[in-house]
């Protein structure tokens, strides 16, 4: 089986800022899988990408350049299944529980997109209050340290690493205090920030790149950034 693995060629098609891409890269790094990565411009998608990605989104995983997988959750599950060990708990109920909270994390990502696209202060703060209440719910579910359920890093941790990373950048131009009074979320965020795979999921210029992206949104967030002189 291991011999067969070495023959497989993994090529991940990505975008530099996409959080769904990050969870796929974290999975590849955690499982020590050799892969190549190609960043594309989503505003100017190459023709070959449109053929490979029926939904027009990243990430896309090309396996041996002939089979194409899309949607990050499916890519992560596949990579986990075809390599030794697992980033999921072995207990089936526990695994399903992790998957449910992964889905919850995807909902937080949608709220974050709504946050940075909000046109005015009122809608921005309303959406932020919703995000804060979602983290308050998560606070009651984090059952271990340093990761979601303890010492072992799981797929759910790969999902929340990119979520927390947004707030590292938001903190540079806002005082949202998203995690005030949420000590478990704070510890978890800190542990994920220090995890090598989470760090390697983005380029070193990610914060500056994200700020530039946000600045161009014509939103309340872009006003905040300009006010800070960034």
Which positions does each model-derived feature cover?
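GST superfamily/GST-like fold recognition
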Residues: 150-174, 178-187, 192
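Conserved residues at the C-terminal ends of beta-strands
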Residues: 64, 161, 204
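Non-globular targeting/processing and membrane-anchoring segments
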Residues: 111, 166, 196-201, 205-230
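Hydrophobic residues in alpha-helical segments
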Residues: 116, 142, 192-193, 202
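GST-like domain detector, emphasizing the conserved glutathione-binding G-site
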Residues: 2-148, 217-221, 225-230
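Hydrophobic/aromatic-lined pockets within catalytic cores
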Residues: 80-84, 106, 143, 164, ...
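Alpha-helical scaffold segments in carbohydrate-active enzymes
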Residues: 23, 100, 104, 137, ...
């Amino acid at each position: 089986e291991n011999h067969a693995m070495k023959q497989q060629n993994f090529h991940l098609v990505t975008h530099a800022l996409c959080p769904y891409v990050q969870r796929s890269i974290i999975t590849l790094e955690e499982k020590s899988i050799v892969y190549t990565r190609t960043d594309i411009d989503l505003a100017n998608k190459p023709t070959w990408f449109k053929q490979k990605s029926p939904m027009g989104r990243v990430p896309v995983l090309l396996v041996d350049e002939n089979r194409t997988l899309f949607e990050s959750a499916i890519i992560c599950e596949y990579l986990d299944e075809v390599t030794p060990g697992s980033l999921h708990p072995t207990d089936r109920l526990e695994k399903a529980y992790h998957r449910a909270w992964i889905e919850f994390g995807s909902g937080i990502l949608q709220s974050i997109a709504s946050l940075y696209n909000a046109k005015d202060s009122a809608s921005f703060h309303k959406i932020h209050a919703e995000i804060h209440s979602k983290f308050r719910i998560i606070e009651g579910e984090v059952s271990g340290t340093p990761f979601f359920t303890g010492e072992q890093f799981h797929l759910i941790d790969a999902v929340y690493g990119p979520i927390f990373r947004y707030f590292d950048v938001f903190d540079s131009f806002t005082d949202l205090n998203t995690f005030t009074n949420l000590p478990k979320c704070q510890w978890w965020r800190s542990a994920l920030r220090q995890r090598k795979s989470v760090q390697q999921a983005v380029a070193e210029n990610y914060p500056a790149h994200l700020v530039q992206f946000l600045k161009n949104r014509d939103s309340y967030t872009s006003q905040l950034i300009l006010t800070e002189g960034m």
